[in-house]
């Protein structure tokens, strides 16, 4: 029979996704067949599986940590906000509809038997499932129809460990408040607490641990030290802490436009890990500076984000940068914005029917109801072999003054030839639908060399850090960190359904 453990958090960005990934790697290293599971994920960071199904990125990196291929069953429901009131609802990788919160709140009850069936299919194939909740289980206005926190735990009778982020402050209030806002049945499901991102001497924390255990009758089974691991971040909250000022000691200054509805910012993880590269996120005109490369990322509402560029003054700044021979790359929605105009006659993305683009590429995009979700391999205009994935609802046509950026050779593992993207005559402006383009080492190394040559400097002096290899190392570091700082014997008992009590054993931080 499958063992299971569910990680819930006191708030968003408490560390649930990373903790699940670490536990998956830990159990995988012990020879267990383990998979992650999150019944419902709200995120603009998504991935396309080998079968062309769309799922949340968090469950992808958790699957990588578990040593298995991403499977849409690990994240059956994906919600992609299109605006402040509506989300695109995706079930098992396929779009169902756009729904507002009230409509979806009523509708999601119909998904419960389907979610249970999906979960059971994973349970039949694995030894352990590590479940992840969303936000906080104490969203008491939503709990009557919850399908992702205590509602999911009840569906499959999973024990829960609550994780709280001490780095933000107020950790004991968040633990106590979360537990006490739950009803009696839900409180009984919480079998342990983990305090995350602790800095300092754990002895100073111990009086608080003793008090919170006494108040809640729930044992603290781990204190995880703050660790500077280079792992993907899925929650857009994490962007709030990203740099906006360039690093004067870096070889290259790369600026990403931080769109209000930015999607797939995981595209830039490969850039973040490279030595002597300054990666920063531009939110307003004052942050623009003098970058060596400007990247316009994907967007879940391209027309509205184009309007943001106009209103903020960033549109003119990007145009001026390009006119002065600056290098600009647009990914997916960013590619669409580089063109002359975007048309949305059926209001697929926005209430706007048409909007002018940046005018840096001779292209025009029309939005369609049909979403393209594929994994691809191809060859760029300069001969680099690349792979990645596409997620978009627009069709872009090139004019005569542009050339295709990439020749696609295979789609979802099947031979298929077509052209992707566009590149300007002077090669300075590139647009592509390929997410993950920067994860290709040769392409990235050549890009760095080009940017440095434009500055009359020698080529990039470092070997490109391969993202896949780098992540494998980070997953192992994470697993070791968790094993050293969680009372694994207590966690094993929880997973077996055995009762554990508040003990006198004190957690000790191990780096």
Curated annotation (Swiss-Prot):
List the GO molecular function terms.
ABC-type vitamin B12 transporter activity; catalytic activity
Q: Where is the active site?
A: 332, 435
UniProt record similarity statement:
Belongs to the CobB/CobQ family. CobQ subfamily.
UniProt key word S-adenosyl-L-methionine: no
Keyword set, alphabetical order: Cobalamin biosynthesis, Glutamine amidotransferase
UniProt gene name: cobQ
Enumerate the Pfam families for this protein: CbiA, GATase_3
Q: In which pathway does it act?
A: Cofactor biosynthesis; adenosylcobalamin biosynthesis
Q: Which GO terms describe its biological process?
A: cobalamin biosynthetic process
Q: Which PANTHER family match?
A: COBYRIC ACID SYNTHASE, DETHIOBIOTIN SYNTHETASE
> What is the designated name of this protein?
Cobyric acid synthase
Where in the numbering of this chain does the GATase cobBQ-type domain appear? 251-443
The task this protein performs is described as: Catalyzes amidations at positions B, D, E, and G on adenosylcobyrinic A,C-diamide. NH(2) groups are provided by glutamine, and one molecule of ATP is hydrogenolyzed for each amidation.
**Species assigned in the record:** Listeria monocytogenes serovar 1/2a (strain ATCC BAA-679 / EGD-e)
Q: What is the lineage of its organism?
A: Bacteria, Bacillati, Bacillota, Bacilli, Bacillales
Does the keyword section mention Glycoprotein? no
Cross-referenced InterPro entries: Class_I_gatase-like, CobQ/CobB/MinD/ParA_Nub-bd_dom, CobQ_GATase1, CobQ_N, CobQ_synth, GATase_3, P-loop_NTPase
């Amino acid at each position: 029979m499958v063992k299971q453990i569910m990680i819930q958090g006191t708030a968003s960005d408490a560390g649930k996704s990373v903790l699940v990934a670490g536990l998956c790697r830990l159990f995988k290293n012990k020879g267990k067949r383990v998979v992650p599971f999150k019944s419902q994920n709200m995120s603009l960071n998504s991935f396309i599986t080998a079968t062309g199904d769309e799922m949340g990125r968090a469950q992808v990196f958790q699957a990588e940590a578990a040593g298995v291929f991403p499977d849409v069953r690990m994240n059956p429901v994906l919600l992609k906000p299109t605006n402040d009131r509506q989300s695109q609802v995706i079930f098992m990788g396929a779009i169902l509809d756009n729904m507002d919160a009230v409509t979806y709140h009523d509708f999601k009850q119909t998904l419960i038997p389907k979610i249970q069936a999906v979960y059971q299919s994973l349970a039949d194939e694995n030894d352990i499932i590590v479940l992840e909740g969303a936000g906080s289980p104490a969203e008491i206005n939503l709990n009557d129809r919850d399908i992702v926190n205590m509602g999911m735990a009840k569906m499959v009778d999973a024990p829960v460990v609550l994780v709280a982020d001490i780095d933000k402050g107020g950790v004991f209030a968040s633990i106590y408040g979360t537990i006490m806002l739950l009803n009696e049945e839900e409180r009984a499901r919480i079998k342990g607490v983990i305090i995350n991102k602790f800095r300092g001497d754990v002895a100073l924390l111990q009086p608080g641990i003793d008090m919170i255990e006494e108040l809640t009758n729930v044992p603290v089974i781990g204190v995880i030290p703050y660790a500077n691991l280079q792992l993907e971040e899925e929650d857009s909250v994490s962007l709030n802490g990203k740099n906006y000022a360039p690093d004067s000691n870096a070889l290259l200054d790369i600026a990403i436009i931080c769109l209000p509805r930015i999607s797939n910012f995981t595209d830039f993880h490969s850039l973040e890990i490279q030595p002597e590269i300054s990666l920063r996120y531009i939110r307003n005109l004052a942050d623009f500076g003098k970058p060596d490369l400007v990247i316009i990322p994907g967007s879940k509402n391209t027309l509205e984000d184009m309007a943001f560029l106009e209103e903020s003054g960033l549109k003119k700044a990007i145009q001026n940068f390009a006119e002065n021979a600056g290098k600009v790359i647009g990914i997916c929605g960013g590619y669409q914005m580089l063109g002359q105009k975007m048309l949305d006659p059926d209001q697929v993305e926005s209430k706007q029917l048409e909007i002018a683009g940046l005018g840096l590429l001779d292209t025009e995009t029309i939005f369609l109801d049909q979403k393209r979700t594929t994994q691809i391999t191809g060859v760029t205009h300069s001969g680099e072999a690349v792979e990645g994935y596409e997620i978009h609802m627009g069709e872009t046509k090139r004019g005569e003054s542009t050339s295709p950026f990439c020749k696609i050779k295979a789609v979802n593992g099947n031979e298929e030839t077509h052209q992707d993207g566009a590149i300007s005559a002077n090669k300075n402006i590139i647009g592509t639908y390929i997410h993950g383009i920067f994860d290709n080492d040769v392409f990235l190394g050549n890009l760095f060399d080009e940017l440095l040559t434009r500055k009359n400097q020698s080529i990039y002096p470092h070997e490109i850090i391969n993202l896949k290899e780098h992540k494998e190392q980070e997953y192992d570091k994470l697993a070791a960190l968790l094993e050293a700082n969680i009372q694994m014997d207590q966690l094993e008992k929880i997973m077996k359904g055995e009762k554990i009590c508040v003990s006198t054993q004190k957690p000790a931080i191990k780096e």
